[in-house]
Design a protein with these regions (language model features):
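Active-site cores that bind ATP or allylic diphosphates and position pyrophosphate for catalysis
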Residues: 1-50, 57-59
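Non-cofactor substrate-recognition interfaces
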Residues: 37-49, 56-245
Length: 245
């Protein structure tokens, strides 16, 4: 893996298809302020915006969350399936069926047994994507800070769909053409925590020097757990994962 990997190569469709990708619905913790006030009104626990990704290794380089300005979103009161903590989360209305069991809708939040089964949930508020724009959230992994612009806020983008995921796109400008375009439009900075060999940079703490994909290791040297899996476990422990597959 001595050859340089351009972000173009890293983003080629099918580059990673031989291995089973780990996907995660990540929870980004909303900061309370004037813009987010309506999300905190009668909230249940902390408030999160949920974003799905099949490239967890790009999450430390997250700089923004992109929503569809005209898409319908809802606020859901529920529990984290891993930590069992109460939480309020934002997802696209049309994606509720992908993440919540219909039979548990409007079940009693007070009677939840905290066993990860039959997690109750309740829709409590509906709004358009453009109403979320400008809301700020806590940095997920504060290994390093973005450069060259603003960061950690919700922006609007025309490429967001509800065909899969949560209707919210985790946006890492260094690792995607759409991400870079929409970030520039909104004055969002960049954060690149992967070197040209495909390894995490020294800022990445316990992950520094690890290849972002096990396929990049020399034959026989790949660890049992890829960094995607390690990051997903860390997110579960932090209470920042809603679904890992």
């Amino acid at each position: 893996a001595g050859t340089g990997l351009s972000s173009h190569e890293l983003n080629q469709p099918g580059t990673y298809k031989p291995a089973k990708d780990t996907s995660v619905v990540t929870l980004f913790k909303v900061k309370p302020d004037h813009a987010s006030e309506f999300l905190f009104n009668d909230a249940f626990g902390d408030v999160f915006i949920a974003a799905w990704t099949t490239t967890p290794w790009t999450l430390p380089s997250n700089c923004a969350l992109t929503v569809g300005p005209k898409l319908d979103y809802v606020r859901v009161k529920t529990f984290n399936p891993y930590t069992h903590e109460p939480q309020t989360m934002v997802v696209a209305k049309s994606r509720l069926g992908a993440y919540f069991n219909e039979k548990n809708q409007d079940a009693s939040l007070e009677d939840y047994k905290k066993d990860g089964k039959n997690v109750p949930w309740k829709v409590d508020g509906e709004f358009f994507g453009h109403q979320l724009e400008g809301i700020r959230y806590e940095q997920l992994f504060p290994y390093a800070q973005p450069e060259g612009g603003d960061a950690f806020k919700v922006i609007g983008g025309d490429f967001v769909t509800t065909e899969d995921g949560t209707g919210v796109v985790h946006t890492a400008p260094s690792f995607g053409a759409d991400d870079m375009r929409v970030a520039r439009q909104h004055g969002i900075g960049t954060l690149t925590l992967v070197d040209l060999q495909g390894r995490f940079t020294k800022e990445m703490g316990e992950f520094a020097g690890k290849y972002v994909k096990n396929e990049y290791y020399p034959a026989g040297q790949a660890p049992e757990k890829s960094v995607d899996v390690e990051l997903s476990i860390k997110l579960k422990e932090m209470g920042r994962a809603f679904k890992v597959e």
